């Protein structure tokens, strides 16, 4: 049973591979996501180390100058996905969102290095400064009172964005001024 599930996981990761990065699902989420890429790399590392590190390197290439690694990297502009790269209106080295996600990336890399060989150690070392910048960004941008508590500023940053945890707080948002969108991406799922 475990072997069958492992094979199924490999099939899904392979199907969602876009040549250097993985999408969570091909229709609903057609871009690279921070958390998803980290966890995908961990899975991919069990059968293809080179491809696993490529996933993380491509993710980190989208890192902002201030250290943030965005939660979405738009390698392509899919007109059926909202909010797409034009929505964010940012000036960065890549088309990205303006949110991040909690930094599980360091834990994933730690695991890949600890369970790997010298190749993994060298790759981990090559990403160390980027990881430090990412964590420093969290402590400077998301802990403004220096209390040691990192906060998030939007449900999408939690990695639990479609969870009922947010219903109470979002219930207070006046949605009258917002436009209802029916997106082809959502309708096709």
Regions found by a protein language model. Give the residues of each.
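Low-complexity, Ser/Thr/Pro/Gly-enriched N-terminal "stalk/linker" regions
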Residues: 1-32, 53-54, 58, 67-72
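Short N-terminal secondary-structure initiator segments
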Residues: 10-36, 40, 122-141, 145, ...
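Active-site-adjacent bridging/hinge elements
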Residues: 10-19, 78-84, 181
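Solvent-exposed loop and edge beta-strand segments that line ligand/cofactor-binding
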Residues: 20-38, 42-47, 82-102
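Helix-terminus loop motifs that line ligand-binding clefts
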Residues: 49-132, 139-157
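Core domains of carbohydrate- and sulfate-ester-processing enzymes
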Residues: 160-178
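Conserved small/polar residues in nucleotide/adenosyl-binding loops
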Residues: 179-185
């Amino acid at each position: 049973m475990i072997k069958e599930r492992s094979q199924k996981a490999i099939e899904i990761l392979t199907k969602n591979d876009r040549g250097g990065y993985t999408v969570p699902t091909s229709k609903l989420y057609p871009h690279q996501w921070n958390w998803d890429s980290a966890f995908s790399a961990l899975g991919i590392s069990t059968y293809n180390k080179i491809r696993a590190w490529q996933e993380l390197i491509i993710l980190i290439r989208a890192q902002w100058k201030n250290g943030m690694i965005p939660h979405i990297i738009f390698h392509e502009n899919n007109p059926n996905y909202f909010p797409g790269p034009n929505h964010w209106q940012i000036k960065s080295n890549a088309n990205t969102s303006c949110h991040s996600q909690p930094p599980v990336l360091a834990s994933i890399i730690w695991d890949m290095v600890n369970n790997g060989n010298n190749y993994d150690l060298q790759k981990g070392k090559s990403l160390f400064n980027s990881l430090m910048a990412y964590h420093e960004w969290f402590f400077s941008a998301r802990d403004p009172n220096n209390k040691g508590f990192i906060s998030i500023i939007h449900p999408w940053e939690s990695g639990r964005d479609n969870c009922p945890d947010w219903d109470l707080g979002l219930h207070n948002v006046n949605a009258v001024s917002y436009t209802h969108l029916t997106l082809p991406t959502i309708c096709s799922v």
